[in-house]
A protein has these predicted regions:
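Low-complexity, flexible helical/coil segments
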Residues: 40, 54-58, 78-86, 113-117
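Short, basic/aromatic beta-hairpin or loop at an interaction surface
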Residues: 12-23, 83-92
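Structural detector for short beta-strands of small beta-barrel domains
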Residues: 1-11, 63-84, 113
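Glycine- and charge-enriched low-complexity intrinsically disordered segments
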Residues: 69-107
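Beta-strand/loop nucleic-acid-binding surfaces
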Residues: 21-36, 91-119
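Short coil-to-beta transition motif at edge beta-strands of beta-rich domains
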Residues: 59-63, 108-110
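Flexible glycine-rich surface loops and low-complexity tracts that mediate binding to linear polymers
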Residues: 6, 39-52, 108-122
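Acidic (E/D-rich), amphipathic helical modules within compact regulatory domains
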Residues: 14-59
């Protein structure tokens, strides 16, 4: 995941919105404190905050990330890669959910969900 663009919300407070891309998909993420700039590589998972509408999808579903209404809210279709840490993958994006996954979700399942915001953890 690479920082494509950094838009400062407040330079004094070190708050920024980052556009993050893997060349195929992209998302907007909140960062505070932000020490990132365009071209930086992100190695840590992104954090999906305020998770809603988790649903199991068909195993042959194609992963996607969709920004909702030009905000920091997003909709995802991703593969579950770690149940204990609530980690999912969409393309090369690794996303940690801020809530535990429901009990009927298994490792390798494709799930869809929405979140109120994506945060850069590091």
């Amino acid at each position: 995941m690479i920082v494509k663009q950094c838009e400062w919300i407040s330079k004094d407070a070190k708050e920024a919105m980052l556009i993050i891309s893997d060349g195929k998909m992209q998302c907007a993420a909140f960062s505070h404190p932000c020490y990132r700039s365009a071209g930086d590589v992100l190695l840590e998972p992104l954090l999906a905050v305020s998770i809603k509408n988790i649903a199991k999808m068909r195993s042959d579903s194609q992963p996607y990330i969709q920004c909702l209404r030009g905000s920091l809210a997003h909709e995802f279709l991703a593969e579950v890669t770690n149940l204990e840490k609530s980690l999912v993958v969409a393309g090369t994006f690794i996303i940690e959910l801020d809530d535990p996954l429901p009990g009927d979700i298994s490792l390798g399942d494709m799930i869809s969900f929405s979140c109120g915001r994506i945060d850069v953890i590091s």
